[in-house]
Amino acid sequence: MAIIFNPNKKIFTLQTAHTTYQMQVDRLGYLLHLYYGAKSTCDMDYVLTYADRGFSGNPYAAGMNRTYSLDTLPQEYPTLGTGDFRNIALDIKNEQGTESVELLYKSYEIRDGKYALKGLPAVWASDDEAQTLEIVLGDDIAGVEVHLLYGVLEGCDVITRSVLIKNTGSGNITIEKAHAACLDMVYGDYDVIRFYGKHAMERNLERTHLGHGTLSFGSRRGTSSHQYNPAVILAQRDTTENAGDCYGMLFVYSGNFSCEAEKDQINQTRLLMGLSDELFSYPLAAGETFTVPEVIMSYSADGFSQLSHQYHTCISEHVCRSRFAHEVRPVLINSWEAAYFDFTGDTIVDLAKEAASLGIDMVVMDDGWFGKRDDDNSSLGDWFVNEKKLGGTLSELIDRVHAQGVKFGIWIEPEMVNEDSNLYREHPDWAIQIPGKLPVRSRNQLILDFSRKEVRDNIFDQICAVFDQGKIDYVKWDMNRSMADVYAGNLAYDYVLGVYDFMERLVTRYPDILLEGCSGGGGRFDAGMLYYSPQIWCSDNTDAINRTRIQYGTSFFYPVSSMGAHVSAVPNHQTGRVTSLKTRGITAMAGTFGYELNPALLSDEEKEEIREQIKTFKKYEMLINEGTYWRLTSPFEDEVAAWMSVSRTKDRALVSVVRLYAEANAAACYVKLKGLESDAVYIEENTGRQYTGAALMNAGIPLPFAVKEYEAYQFSFIRLDEAKKLYDEIKKVCGNLKLNEADTADSASDNRIVISIYGGSGSGKTTIAAALQQYFLNDNTACYVLTGDNYPHRIPMRNDEERLNVYNESGEDGLRGYLGTPKEIDFDRINKELSEFKTGKDIIEIKHMGREDGDISYDETDFTGIKVLILEWTHGGSEYLKGVDIPVFLESSPEETKARRIKRGRDENAASPFICRVVELEQEKLDLQGKNARIVVGKDGKVYEQ
């Protein structure tokens, strides 16, 4: 069990895979904090010390014991008015103006699963992934009951905390301060790491030693803000990326927040995170309950990298709910920097044509398509299509864009209103303003009062009327100002809940729309937003060099897959800096990847480079988004910015490096890698050079000497393992083929061979195929890798549904007759492509299948000069597959396949009984097909010919 209660000592122990959190109800009924750190099975009540300290008062219940003081004891949830003069988590005022709540223990409950918060985003998990502890504290005199909620996600090494505050009295109370989490540390010398910034330069890392007193930061802007992110790290002074103790707190909230770190009179440390108490005074009538948003806590004994990995996993697996969270996402181009407000429908279609020719998947029509909006002074609130500007209906424009073979996206800013709008003229009271005072303008716009349901309903209906006009694939939700005219103490909180309500309704109604958050870039980049949108525009600053810092700071808590990052034009529109297209591309690949430029202004050479960039990104997209992200250097301290992604099975790695400045007669620069298998051998794809993992991590790789400023490099590594032995065996088998000779009309067929690599799901087919390709290329033999995943009749989600339908209708025999047969697989198509290759055809239409309905294309591919085609596919040994010269079977068991699928982390239901049975049935067929293999790679890694 993740949560254990010792009834004799009244100690609560929360255990994750590598951490322990403990607290105790003491003899007076106070809930004291004992320990948070590396995993332990010991009761930690011995850490409490008691001393008589002057001017630190004693609860009356302590009698004559002057050593017992809430001013010095570590508390779980400290309150005002109890003799604790440090910063407190909760302040409640009654009708007489008294601010004193003394919380004593009442009860607890442990239950499976993760608690949910009504109307608020929160970490979610299945019953077997999490447990909940609910501790009830109360003050019967004050009429207040507090429910402390703890969610323990053992596998992620995170603990979540939230608080419910109930008015159990007969009168009204007012909440003046409410934090979700308090962490008291009885000893230690700490640094505080926060992520400060400004518009277009967000989340810069700042590390400050915590001296005596309070270090605090937060937001009173109505959003989490560009200025400070709602995240903090408390670290021992010697903690580095790879070693040392550090504690993280991440607030799952998109509004005003506060973080306070205090070192007290006896060198104890207190860390608090929750709602800002500025512009906050929340009335609570008798019987009402208030919910404090959630904090995600995590601890690492192995430095900041491990802490980041824990947060990345938690957010990817247990915060983001979108079906796009683990899917391949479209490479998009946004019209903003290409056209700003100056566009027509033809402009967007022309952009779509250019995009299609470059291999871009989607065009996004940004601000300016609605009302009479040709600048930023009007029409926010009037969400009807400007058909005159677009030259037709939105439906017609969407169809024209889709006809180019690309998806369509659109921009909205639903929370805002211009005074020059029909909505404002009809409902001026819907804009937030203090009665009797003129409002504060920002960007010539006001904020709609989303705390009011009628306001939300009006805008929601308008937006839906637009979205229902055609197949919209993507929406960018923007928010371009801070809140100033706070007319009531409950407004800021209720406003954010209104935004969440709107977003929940939107994603529920349109689950197939990819939603991207934005607030002038990264002004609302937080876990609360990621609950609704799997990605957020990281910053309005697209300068590649500035972005290395912005994305570096963002990566401490948020995964790469959440960071909107694009290649933009040069000179950069924000900084005026000129960087190469290569540098801009490599930097943008550390995010969702897309473009913010006008392709019509590009040279033919630049367009070709973009095509290659997109191919490169798509090749590594799943590695980047699903792999483990490592920071290799700090762009704040080092001469290069370097980072890498490593597959979860540690068989592939992509390293990216950007030089931040050039220096005459510069010293050699080396970058040490991380996260590899020490004893494994890796080959670098571009050079063919081989290294051990230990060498790459301990000695590093030398960078080329800089020729000019801001150069960038990428290095791709593949673990060899059995691939080299397999290659040698393949060369023996096909040794009589003259693969290095040019084709002639008579020899083309004889000189081309097809190799299939087949085995259980997750058995390493992709990695081995990539390594084999590299070996062939090193021997000057052109080679192409074809994935069989493109050849089912249905996209993956629909195929999974069909498998289940077949099983429900026809049982296991029916399922066995479906899996890997022409009922499931388009063998006619793949056999046609293989036949055309074998007979010497140079231009072949290759099928490509995405993960969305209708996402199927047939792309002309040039096979001129290619001698070897490697097909990596579970069904590469099927009796229905024709034209394979050398079938290679990778032995595995269902248990191994299941373990690899879970480790890979790509399949949500990898451990479900049905999927496990599918794997077993597939393995039965594979074992039979293995007998027909020319070469077998055994479970022990040995390679032999049959």
For the regions a protein language model found, what residue spans apply to each?
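Aromatic-lined carbohydrate-binding/catalytic grooves of carbohydrate-active enzymes
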Residues: 324-461, 474
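Carbohydrate-binding surface patches
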Residues: 241, 634-677
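Conserved nucleotide-sensing/catalytic segment adjacent to the nucleotide-binding pocket
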Residues: 784, 793-852
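ATP-dependent NMP and nucleoside kinases share a basic, alpha-helical "lid"
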Residues: 856-904
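Small-molecule kinase domains that catalyze NTP-dependent phosphoryl transfer to phosphate-bearing small molecules
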Residues: 906-946
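C-terminal beta-strand-rich structural cap/linker in extracellular carbohydrate-active enzymes
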Residues: 693-722
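Polysaccharide-binding surfaces and accessory modules of carbohydrate-active proteins
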Residues: 5, 10-13, 17, 21, ...
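Active-site neighborhood of glycoside hydrolase catalytic domains
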Residues: 389-393, 425-582, 592-597, 601
